[in-house]
Amino acid sequence: MGTPRQFYQILKAQQHSYVPEEIVKLFAQIDAKRLELLAVNLAKYISTNLPLAINRRDGLEDYRTNPYVLMTCANVMKLHKPEDFAKFLFDSKFYMGLETSFGKSMEAAFVSAYPVKSGDGEKWIDPPEKVAEAAALEGLANEEKALKRTSSVWREIDKSVVLNGRRYLTSIKSGPNCINDTQVQAMTAAIVGNHKGWMRHSQETYKQVKELDIVVGITYGTDRTSNNKENQILVKLLGHGFVEEDREKKPGVLIDEETRSIRVYRRIGKEFWAFIGDPVQPDSAGYIFLEILLALAKGLSKGLGEASLETRINLKMASLAAALSKMMLPMGSLPEWVRKEFSESELFWFATAMTAFYDEGI
């Protein structure tokens, strides 16, 4: 079978170099009608949900951040004025918000348009079993929901599709560095503990299912640029009911040793979107990542125009700057040695970071 080190080398071996001629060929395969539909749906989503993401943050307490990193950034970036500080805080939190929950929602909107060769009833969907799990939590207190979620069977699975007697389950990760050690352990434990149950439930829900593929998907990046955490999941599965299916013909693909009907592998960047576009023959769908990017560009231009975001953003930053100004310490109330040792900018940075230790602060 080889050692884990050799396994990592195999997973990292594939190189993805930018070749303009290849991109031109991929452009020729894009479906203009599907792209337009994706763009329209995305524009609707953005015009409705992006303003909500902006409006969600009101006071300083909605901009919580690390006070130590904050003071360092403020010094390096020379953020001397409340207005500059407000823009920095807003921009950083806005980006983080888009990269997490809002970004994940947009990814879901894209995924549901595929696979390309499927019928109307064969698109990527939320697993019905996961939907049922969530429905069972309705009406429970938050504490009860938290307890129930610890025993969730489908928590790690985001999307599902059935094609040609095989069910594909995918756990979608936003980027090549977003999986941490805790998530590695959670995903590994979920697969080890639930893969037989996932197969059983799949065959109960879809009578035609004979095989199951469990795929860790990363929406951008390459095999060589990831932080290796997705590969650690695969390595940890070796010896826990899974073996390599065929190192030469199917590098990086694991299969359950007992029934040899359940596979686990990961797909990154272009290969992830090719898998989403055609799980059965992903090599024929290498253009899907371009289709997604073009739809995003078109959808953003439409959606942002309809949402009138510029005024909202400016109002939020002005409100945040005013709140930061109120946090300034009165110079006359400070000890003389403090007034001598620290500049007005340094005291502003200090006062802003200090609010992180209070309910009303950042």
Label the model's feature ranges.
Residues S174-R263, R267:
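Catalytic cores of nucleic-acid endonucleases
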Residues Q15-S17, Y114, G139, K207, ...:
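Short, flexible coil/linker elements and helix-boundary hinge sites characteristic
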Residues Q9, E21, K25-A28, T48, ...:
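Polar/charged alpha-helical tracts
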Residues P4-F7, V19-I23, E230, G286, ...:
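Short amphipathic alpha-helical segments that mediate assembly, nucleic-acid/protein binding
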Residues S101-S202:
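Catalytic centers of nucleases
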Residues H80-D84, N180, I268:
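General structural signal for secondary-structure boundaries
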Residues E248-I362:
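Non-catalytic C-terminal interaction segments of nucleic acid-processing enzymes
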Residues G2-F110:
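Interdomain/boundary linker segments immediately adjacent to catalytic/signaling cores
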